[in-house]
Amino acid sequence: MARLNPLSFTPGPVIFFTCAVYIALFAALLTVHLRVPDYPSKTPDGVNLTQAWSDLEKITRRFHPYNSHANDDVRDYLLTRVKSIIASKKLGGDQVELIDDNESNATFSSGSTTVYFEGTNIIVAIRGSEDDEPYHSPQSSPPGERRLDNGGVLVNAHYDSVSSGYGATDDGVGVVTVLQLLSYFTESKNWPKRTVILLLNNGEEDFLNGAKAFMRHPISQIAHTFVNLEGAGAGGRATMFRSTDTEVTRYYKASSHPFASVVSGDGFKKRLIRSETDYKVFYEELGLRGLDIAFMEPRARYHTVEDSTRETSLNSVWHMLSAAIATTSGLASDTSEQFSGSEDEHEPYTGKVKTGHGTDAVWFDLFGKVFVVFQLHTMFALCVTLLVVAPLFLIGLTFGLSKADKNYLFARKAYMYSSDDDHPVHLYGWRGFFRFPIVFSIATAVVVGLAYLMVRLNPLILYSSPYAVWSMMLSAWFSVAWFFSRGASAMRPSALQRMYALIWLFAGSFALLAFVTVLSNNYQVAGGYFALFYFAGIFLALVLSYLELFFAPTKTAFARYSAQGDEPVSRPLTGTTTAARSEEPPIADDDATETTSLLRGDRRSFARHSGRRDSIDDENGNRDEEPVQLDLKQPYPGEQDWSGKLPGWLWLLQLLLVAPIVVILVGQIALLLTSALHQTPADGNSSLFVYLAFALLTTLLLAPIGPFIHRFTWHVPTFVFLVCVATVIYNLVAFPFSREHRLKVYFVQQVDLATGNNRVSLTGVDGYVQRIVADLPSAQGEQINCTTPEAANRKELMTCTWPGLPAQVVTRASRFSNKTDTDGWLDFSITTSNKTNEATISVAGQNTRACRIVVDSHHSGVTNVTVAGAVSDPRFKAVGETGSREIRLWHREWSHPWNVSVTWPRENSKPSGRIICLWSDANAGDIPAFDEVQHYLPVWAIPSKISDGLVEGFKYFQV
């Protein structure tokens, strides 16, 4: 009895190894993605995780947005901690300086909005051990004009939270990381070579205001590189969101647990990700080179009360802290000039530090252990090389096979001597060529159809059950692909089916790589890096298939061998010939005729070859030839007999070439996009885009199974099909939200201060927000008006408004005002000059430090804005090119007035509009409507702020 080959291309080994590869890699990827590495028992000198956690608990006790009294308390605590750390270290004096910045202000514009902001940043400068010159000389030169040098490193985190969240992850972990960096770098053994600037900025949540104020301080010109610490979730791993260039990114490589993909960087670069961080200011406006390290999931807890210490962990703190230490230490140890600009590019007052030019980068991690980074130009060169070399190499192999008479691809017939033979041997080389594209198209169409079905019937199920959606799509693609591939193989078996599938995969990945190459060269998009490895693996696997054919007999030898009667000349179109032949009764000895085979009991004979043999004998003079001896093993049932000569184990090498690298790289991208996108439809993003992304990635993940799937027996596909049915049913009928994955609804209360009328609004997903509002006590019996929001990025949502509980943001703060009615919350006056197009608007809000002046939409806006006390800066334009229709005012003092001078075009009418003041402090129960929403929301929903203020009190004005 022949021994079973455990590596042969038969169902058992194929099922075992294919399932083992995919299951093992999927499990490993999910473990790395979902589990945060444990913090070490021993930390580096200067790092105290217990103290870091204590700091995090203290600064996140209450909501602390810029416009809240709790924000002042957090600032006082941070100042105390910074002073305590500096005092406890040996490094001090001229080496470390604390800057309590209560002076910097900035006036700038974005679009049709002007912002005046007064900063309250905390800055600590640690002079580098190799920096001999003073690093801080405020009086020496204005910002934007200072000496060129090799620069230092800026590390930034913001200590303000949003008005609806405690800010543990956004950005409390970043803040305590900065405190630990201060403790670490002020250890004498850790003294950095380059100056390190530690910035705790205030006001990031409202318009990146704190970073803008930092630009006004002279010390902003010291650093040439930066590390920005952020948070957009609650716990988990901190990923490197984006980076400016290859040279900076290489220093992240020292992180003990890297977690990053350039795909997220491309998302920011191409504006697919709407939110912004201080990275934008440091890179685009200050000219620094650096990177963003941030938490990114779960987004359902972002900017809510669940962004708390309860939802994060010390492991998450260590993950960010360890990455920050490694990256900052590396950058601060770089004494080269790669981050320095040249003299000839220095232009006074450009506002940008001269940091040289970096190269676009490609980066990704492998299982959170290895970090790969190289230049985008290198990727482009490799792509072009593969696109040229791979086809030429395959053409060469094809030519070699043809010369060796072993090219069975597309071969219909073979002849013993020449095409003049009467009866050629049929090789069926075309059989199976069109199977893979048909199977691939049908399976892909099914998952795309499921995507549209989900969008139609239950689009938000991916909000709480993204992995159920993944299971549905993966199982659907696999089961459909198996059904058609196995069916085709059963009807028309072909030994070339695997090779033809690889040829089609080669063609498809060639087109994909060509597309990625164009994107990388013309648009600097690096997220297609996986296509390079995808194509390379398929190319090598296909090369093995070509080499495998060199083990086959020559077509001529096989034809002669078949003609001898030892093997059948050809097989019918079905794969049942062998079985059918075995069921026919053998010809008895007594029935032997002149055409009976010499092998008794075998119906195969020379009769069908007699005519051909006669012609051959006539042509060749009845020459005698030695019988052709071919050691053909039994082929897989139903497949071409010549394939019995092929090695049966090469398929495993092919599987290992195409599957693991695809699963690892595409799987990591799939998990990253899942975390980043699956809860964005609740913010107004398109759910169809997310489902189609899942469908595309499903196809990319499972396509490498295509060459092998026809060997699977029915057992595994049946189980997978049952999983598909179960997940389809679940995804169609399950409620999309849960206590763990709450739907965010966005709150704001608007008060007409002249009349006292107030309207509370909740914005959320259509169909769900109405249910939420209807159950609120204050909305019962009231007329609820639901309309589409005006904001372009929330057109997919619905805003429901009703008369809410009156706000008490001023009456309880009696120390700020003796007035108890809403009219006293905001005072303003307008003074006009002799000129017909100028006016000064004085605004004073009670118990607030944030107000706005909004010009009506029918007016073109103002062309000049000057705020009393503002310092001009040539780097900032107070008004954009199209004018300003909104002026946002922020003051570091409470209830402090603003005097704003505005100018408008002479040909326009005098502006009119609204003056609005904001109240954002929800800690003391001064906003009963918000407290009511928090209290009465169903367990599957949670409130968040929709704008800078929870309460907007307004009065109308006319110049």
UniProtKB/Swiss-Prot annotation:
Cofactor section: Zn(2+)
Residues bearing glycans: 48, 102, 105, 685, 785, 818, 834, 864, 899
Cellular-component GO terms for this entry: vacuolar membrane
Membrane topology: Multi-pass membrane protein
Residues binding Zn(2+) 2: 170, 205, 303
Gene Ontology terms for molecular function: metal ion binding; metalloexopeptidase activity
Stretches of the chain found on the membrane's Vacuolar side: 35-378, 454-463, 520-524, 667-688, 738-959
EC number(s) recorded for this UniProt protein: 3.4.-.-
Active-site residues, as the UniProt record annotates them: 204 (proton acceptor)
Membrane topology, Cytoplasmic segments: 1-13, 400-432, 485-498, 546-645, 710-716
Annotated S-S bridges: none
Region spans: Disordered: 128-149, 566-594, 606-635
Family: Belongs to the peptidase M28 family.
Cited PANTHER family: METALLOPEPTIDASE M28 FAMILY MEMBER (PTHR12147), VACUOLAR MEMBRANE PROTEASE (PTHR12147:SF58)
Protein name: Vacuolar membrane protease
Source species of the chain: Phaeosphaeria nodorum (strain SN15 / ATCC MYA-4574 / FGSC 10173)
